[in-house]
């Protein structure tokens, strides 16, 4: 049996390589060996969160695995057929729900029916897309490709306690349409969600107010920001925690997102301003996708029916790394015209 070999220390060298490689393995049916997993990190190897992501994909495709344990720097993943159905995953910590779903939703494209998965963990945690971004930006772009990906948040989960609950439904598409979205068009709206749990309601209100002031001043548009709070005594969250997600939409259906998380000792106004300033900065590049959406959508475009071209507000280190992994599995060429951290145009040409 020949294995696709992936060096987990390549490029960005983090959990993204693992998630993309395992998702692509299940999608294509190609077995993979991933070594040097997170080799350059302070604590190398599989973390709790990464372990659960691999296990979740393995469960939906009956994969045979080797090396699945905390701290392991090498795994072998041999996928079977991807099966629709209902699944449950408990990360058991504040590990990111959305990062786990990155791998699962890629694999689910090959399923023989809809995949429904209830995931417990962190919905709004550092170094990962907040769940409101996943719903309002990520799922929006997948829908444009023809992939229906729906999320329902039953409970939010923040660091360190987690406890969030999200129900995801993925309907495998017959085909994926290519994407052409280089330049952000005429700004039509800015929307958002500002939330707080196990905290006074004014925290979410102040986040939204601070963000609104910057958006009105810099963009000349009044944003619609939903306030999500819970009355004391009827708050089901383990909390405390807060955050804000914003997204701007143009006249062509392109969306750019931005977000910020609350932290102990960080004023709510700072949280709101952080997200708004990030959004304004990204919009000023004139590109259609924010840097995070760029690397997240790339694997899906690699199996689309035709060439795609899109603009990103900046080249995230995950983007060239994801391109490298995808090219290991599929006859596709990815060209990134721009430097890391700067706006760029990306062309994806499936050759199959």
Curated annotation (Swiss-Prot):
ATP-binding keyword on record: yes
Keyword Acetylation annotated: no
Residues holding ATP: 102, 292-296
GO biological process, any: RNA processing
Gene Ontology molecular function: any one: RNA-3'-phosphate cyclase activity
SUPFAM superfamilies, A to Z: EPT/RTPC-like, RNA 3'-terminal phosphate cyclase, RPTC, insert domain
EC id: 6.5.1.4
Keywords for this protein: ATP-binding, Cytoplasm, Ligase, Nucleotide-binding
Localization per Swiss-Prot or TrEMBL: Cytoplasm
Residues annotated as catalytic: 318
Similarity field: Belongs to the RNA 3'-terminal cyclase family. Type 1 subfamily.
Function according to Swiss-Prot or TrEMBL: Catalyzes the conversion of 3'-phosphate to a 2',3'-cyclic phosphodiester at the end of RNA. The mechanism of action of the enzyme occurs in 3 steps: (A) adenylation of the enzyme by ATP; (B) transfer of adenylate to an RNA-N3'P to produce RNA-N3'PP5'A; (C) and attack of the adjacent 2'-hydroxyl on the 3'-phosphorus in the diester linkage to produce the cyclic end product. The biological role of this enzyme is unknown but it is likely to function in some aspects of cellular RNA processing.
Protein name: RNA 3'-terminal phosphate cyclase
Gene source species: Methanopyrus kandleri (strain AV19 / DSM 6324 / JCM 9639 / NBRC 100938)
Lineage, opening ranks: Archaea, Methanobacteriati, Methanobacteriota, Methanomada group, Methanopyri
């Amino acid at each position: 049996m020949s294995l696709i070999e992936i060096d987990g220390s390549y490029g960005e060298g983090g959990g993204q390589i693992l998630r993309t490689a395992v998702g692509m393995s299940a999608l294509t049916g190609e077995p993979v060996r991933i070594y040097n997993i997170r080799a350059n990190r302070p604590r190398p190897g599989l973390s709790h969160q990464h372990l659960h992501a691999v296990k979740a994909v393995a469960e939906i495709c009956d994969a045979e695995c080797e090396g699945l344990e905390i701290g392991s720097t090498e795994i072998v993943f041999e996928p079977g057929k991807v099966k629709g159905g209902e699944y449950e995953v408990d990360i058991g910590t504040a590990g990111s729900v959305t990062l786990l779903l990155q791998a699962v939703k890629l694999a689910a494209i090959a399923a023989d029916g809809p995949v429904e998965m209830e995931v417990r963990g962190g919905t709004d945690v550092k170094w990962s897309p907040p769940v409101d971004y996943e719903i309002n930006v990520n799922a929006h772009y997948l829908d444009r490709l023809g992939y229906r990906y729906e999320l329902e948040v039953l409970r939010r989960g923040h660091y360190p306690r987690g406890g969030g609950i999200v129900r995801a439904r993925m309907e495998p598409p017959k085909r994926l349409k290519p994407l052409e979205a280089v330049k952000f068009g005429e700004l039509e709206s800015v929307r958002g969600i500002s939330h707080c749990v196990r905290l006074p309601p004014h925290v979410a209100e102040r986040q939204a107010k601070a963000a609104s002031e910057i958006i009105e001043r810099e963009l000349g548009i009044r944003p619609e920001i939903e306030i999500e709070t819970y009355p004391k005594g009827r708050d089901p969250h383990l909390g405390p925690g807060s955050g804000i997600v914003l997204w701007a939409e143009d006249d062509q259906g392109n969306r750019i997102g931005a977000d910020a998380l609350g932290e102990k000792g960080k004023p709510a106004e700072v949280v709101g301003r952080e997200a708004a300033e990030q959004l304004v900065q990204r919009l000023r590049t004139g590109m259609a996708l924010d840097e995070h959406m760029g690397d997240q959508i790339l694997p899906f475009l690699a199996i689309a029916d035709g060439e795609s071209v899109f603009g990103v507000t900046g080249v995230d280190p995950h983007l060239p790394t994801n391109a490298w992994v995808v090219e290991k599995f599929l006859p596709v060429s990815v060209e990134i015209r721009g430097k890391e951290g700067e706006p760029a145009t990306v062309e994806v040409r499936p050759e199959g």
